[in-house]
Structures are given as C-alpha cells and as structure tokens.
Amino acid sequence: MVETYHQPAPRSAATGLPVSMKIFMYLLTVFLITQMIGSALFAVYLHRRLDKIEDERNLHEDFVFMKTIQRCNTGERSLSLLNCEEIKSQFEGFVKDIMLNKEEKKKENSFEMQKGDQNPQIAAHVISEASSKTTSVLQWAEKGYYTMSNNLVTLENGKQLTVKRQGLYYIYAQVTFCSNREASSQAPFIASLCLKPPNRFERILLRAANTHSSAKPCGQQSIHLGGIFELQPGASVFVNVTDPSQVSHGTGFTSFGLLKL
C-alpha cells in the first residue's frame, strides 16, 4: 500500500484595503473637514446677523417711541391720555439724564480750570548782565534764552527775583569766573545765594567757594548753587559774590532762576 503525502498550499498574504475603500475614506474625511469649516463660518455669520438684527430692533423701538411722542403732541385720539402721560414722563426722564451728564462734565471742566488758576506755574530764568562788575550783588537781565512765566515773579532793579505767591521753590544759580585774574586778595572766590524776606533782614541760603588758579590763559571755573526753600509773598532772592570783576558774562556762563514746585 503506497501512501501519498500532499503538502498544503501556502496561505496567501493579507492584502490591504481595496482601492475603493481608500477613496471612500478620503472623501469622507474631506467632507467632515469641509462641514466643520462651514459650520464655523455659519456660526460667525449668524452671530453677526443676530447683532445686526438686535441693533435694527433697538433703532425700530426708538423710532416707534419718538413717533408715539409726536402723536401724543398732536393729540391723536388713537392713544389714551394715560399712555401719553407715561411716555412723556419717560422722555422727560431721559432728557434730564442727558442734561445732568452735561452739567457734571461742565462742572468738572470748570473745576480743572479753577485749579489751574489757583496753582499757576511760576518760573524764572535770567542771564547775567556784564555791567555788574563794581557791586557784589550780581545784576541780571531778561535777554537771550530767559524765562519769566507771569507777573507772579518779577526781576526787581535787575538784581533780585521777587515772588508774589507763597510756596516751595527750587532756586538755583550758576556763576562762572576767571580764576587767575589779579584778585584783590588771596581769599577764595565765594558765591552766595541770599534771601530777603518781606520786612526782615537778609540771610544766606547757600554758599560755595572755589580757589584761584595760576593757569594761563584765564582758567574758567563754575560754581553751582541750588536748593528747595519756602518763600513767602514778597520775598526776594539774589546772588552775591566776593569779587564781581572775575565773573564771566559770556553766553551760558552765569545764570540765575527759580521754579515753584
């Protein structure tokens, strides 16, 4: 007896999705994405449309309200007296609110203007005058890049700044001098910022000194003074130096001023 052996045929390898299925899935994906985008755009359009409808409805209500007021004024019989009185009362309240808002704004603007009038800016900046070579109190002039904000500060006799309003003031001075000129003594050059209160004696607020130099030609040196002080109405401030003949009066060398804080 002869037994025959038959080897089973190998299984075929698994194949992928059919082409038709791939096309279907692709089209389905495109459809879903398109639908999502379309839904989002429609939602935006609907939202804007609803806002526009709401605005139109409000305008229509305002138009109807104004039309009703007009009909009440003309005395049409289609409206009862009670309705007209109620509508007129609402309209009068609306007008009163508008007028109150306008009055409040006017009061605020008036208050700001009064506040500005009560606290005006006070400032002065003057330049040295070359004629002040014989007196220890430096003289000044309203020339060049000077400042005199208003009549609440004045330059009196070309020597002192006088204020007419009480307050805190920043007062400053810059004095430039030629340090190697023949001085009357070997004492240092001293610049003083002085105060003359009304009906009181003068007093020194600030003082600075600088030594002489033997440099040739003229060795220019500058002294700076500055501080914050309380001034009364009618108070005056001025600058005093030990040797006015050494002071340099060129452009920007020597100046004096104040500013109300």
Curated annotation (Swiss-Prot):
PTM: The soluble form derives from the membrane form by proteolytic processing.
InterPro entries: CD40L, TNF_CS, TNF_dom, Tumour_necrosis_fac-like_dom
Record: glycosylation sites: N240
Main location: membrane
SMART domains, sorted: TNF
TM ranges: 23-43
Gene Ontology terms, MF aspect: CD40 receptor binding; cytokine activity; protein serine/threonine kinase activator activity; tumor necrosis factor receptor binding
Annotated S-S bridges: C178-C218
Record-linked PROSITE patterns: THD_1, THD_2
Site (Cleavage) residue list: E112, M113
Chain ranges of the THD domain: 122-261
Cell location: Cell membrane; Cell surface
Membrane protein topology class: Single-pass type II membrane protein
Single biological process term from Gene Ontology: positive regulation of T cell proliferation
GO CC terms: cell surface; extracellular space; plasma membrane
Keywords, in A-Z order: Cell membrane, Cytokine, Disulfide bond, Glycoprotein, Membrane, Secreted, Signal-anchor, Transmembrane, Transmembrane helix
Residues exposed to the Extracellular side: 44-261
Residues exposed to the Cytoplasmic side: 1-22
Pfam family, one: TNF
Family, per entry: Belongs to the tumor necrosis factor family.
Subunit details: Homotrimer. Interacts with CD28. CD40 ligand, soluble form: Exists as either a monomer or a homotrimer. Forms a ternary complex between CD40 and integrins for CD40-CD40LG signaling.
Protein purpose: Cytokine that acts as a ligand to CD40/TNFRSF5. Costimulates T-cell proliferation and cytokine production. Its cross-linking on T-cells generates a costimulatory signal which enhances the production of IL4 and IL10 in conjunction with the TCR/CD3 ligation and CD28 costimulation. Induces the activation of NF-kappa-B. Induces the activation of kinases MAPK8 and PAK2 in T-cells. Mediates B-cell proliferation in the absence of co-stimulus as well as IgE production in the presence of IL4. Involved in immunoglobulin class switching.
Protein name in UniProt: CD40 ligand
Lineage of source species: Eukaryota, Metazoa, Chordata, Craniata, Vertebrata
